[in-house]
Amino acid sequence: RESVEVFEVDPRGERPTASWVGCVVAPAGVGLNSVAALPGDGFVATNFQRPEGELWEWQPGEGWERVPGSITNGPNGVEASSDGAWLYIGGWGTQSLIRISRGRSPVEVESADVGFHIDNVRFAPDGSVLAAGHVGPTADSIFRCLRQGECDGLQSRVARVDPESLVVD
């Protein structure tokens, strides 16, 4: 089954322990990739599909809902602003960081080109968004590296992006 597994971590002992709390089974046909917590007890997750995948939101008592305006080519990493108003998606297929509003109508979608296939997205201590990924001679070269260990010409990259202006460093 495809699911998000939830654990409670207790770091207080000599060794940290993790206790399974429960799980949320994915909607049929959805292959979850990256997950980010939302304020409260909800979360968002990417469905990495090419040419069209999307973001899904889960809330207790409501279940899963496709995030409006989130369809893109290969959504990979995801992060949410601390207030939950903005979602940041690693656009693997578009080689861009995508910012999408949450809870607004109409949905606001903007992106910043980074020039590589984004795999992971996280906030840095200074509040900027770090987008990490890879670039190679072709998009398939990344999959060839993962599957067969043929990694010639493949490079890892990280971009720092301002979460408000979407200016890329």
Predicted regions and their residues:
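A short loop-to-beta-strand structural motif that recurs across blades of beta-propeller domains
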Residues: 3-5, 53-56, 96-98, 157-159
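Acidic, Gly/Ser/Thr-rich repeat motifs that build Ca2+-stabilized beta-propeller blades
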Residues: 1-11
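Short, conserved, GDST-rich strand-edge loop motifs in beta-rich repeat architectures
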Residues: 1, 45-52, 132-153
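Short loop/turn segments that connect beta-strands within beta-propeller blades
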Residues: 9-13, 58-62, 101-105, 162-166
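Oxyanion-binding "anion nests"
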Residues: 79-82, 86-99
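Predominantly a core beta-strand signature of beta-propeller blades
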Residues: 18-21, 63-66, 107-111, 167-168
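A beta-strand-loop signature enriched in Asp, Gly, Thr, and Trp
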Residues: 96-146
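Beta-rich, blade/repeat-based domains predominating
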Residues: 1, 20, 25-45, 49-54, ...
